[in-house]
Amino acid sequence: RISIQGNTITITSNIVLTGSMATEQLAQAYQKNIMDNWGKLTTYKYNDVVYDIVWDVNVRVAEEGESLVHDGTNNFLEVTNYVSKIKFTTNQGEIRGVGWASKSFDETNPMSHEFGHILGLKDKYKKIKMENGKYDYITLKGWQNNIMGEYSGEGKVEYKNLDYILPNVIHHFNLFENLTDIAPWTEYYFINGNNREK
């Protein structure tokens, strides 16, 4: 969920961890990973207007018996030791909770990449089959060293990531400015299947 008040853009996301592997320690590690990467982007300039960015992100473990309320702010991720399937939805999926490719979890924390998907971004790599029958991933041209194009823990968040998200948000709020009293649904911009990066 994204909102704009004056020149402040607030990006709000509650990430709820599910499954037997979900722990408070993981929740803290995931949240730190987001803030250490996405949280470094604190301003955004568009059409000569500079906006401040507030990252209102909370990662926690689901409470026992908690219902999965899909309200555009909550995102539910099942913690697994291997992501066996990919779901192209905004608010529900899987996330790896262990290390990968002989590296530790701290080196390969996948949360900032997965958070990019929550924000509506797509992968910037393609899967190819090699001569030995195994698969590898090739980063798309122009996306080297980017959080959406590299292996977990290797890419960085860049302003061009926001260029795929925030212009649409700003247009939304410019269009519906001063209409929230009669159209309260315009108060927030929700990322969904219609406005995700194609």
Short names for language-model regions:
Residues 10-14, 116-118, 146-150:
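Structural recognition of the beta-strand scaffold that forms the well-ordered cores
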Residues 100-106, 128-198:
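Metalloprotease/metallohydrolase-associated module, dominated by Zn2+-dependent proteases
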Residues 4, 50, 72, 140-143:
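A generic structural signal for short, non-catalytic loop/turn and secondary-structure boundary residues
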Residues 1, 24, 60, 196-198:
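Surface-exposed charge patches in extracellular/virion surface proteins
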Residues 17-20, 34, 125-126, 154-155:
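Solvent-exposed loop/turn segments at secondary-structure junctions
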Residues 1-4, 67-68:
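Short, exposed beta-strand/loop patches in secreted or surface proteins that constitute
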Residues 3-29:
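Fold-level signature of zinc-dependent metallopeptidase catalytic domains
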Residues 24-136:
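Metzincin-family zinc-dependent endopeptidase catalytic domain
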